[in-house]
Amino acid sequence: MPGSSDWSFPFEEPLHEVFPALHDAQSSWLSQIDSLSAPDRKTHELIRLVCTVILRNPPGIRRHAQLAREVGAEWEEVLGSIMLTTPAFGMLAAVEAMSHARDGFDAARPPEAD
């Protein structure tokens, strides 16, 4: 059985302990989503960032802001994506997300130069 350091998300270990086949199927499904060729990877991460803002999921916000930067997003693109949630989901969720997004963005490895 994999160790705690083998999990990408905190929910994985307890899920795997109780429902290993479900966890494996979910991991496979998520891997297929990550391998989509369109939209491009930066847009993909910005969309997933917006989804985590809407869900008010700070760990997800940090993760997708980090991944967005690692694939070339600028801070203005991250912040602009967050602000696009305000008409439908309100200002509070966006404002709360900003510090989590900044933490993730700042923790990212710089994008590779072409």
Regions found by a protein language model. Give the residues of each.
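Mid-chain, well-packed structural core segment of small domains
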Residues: 55-83
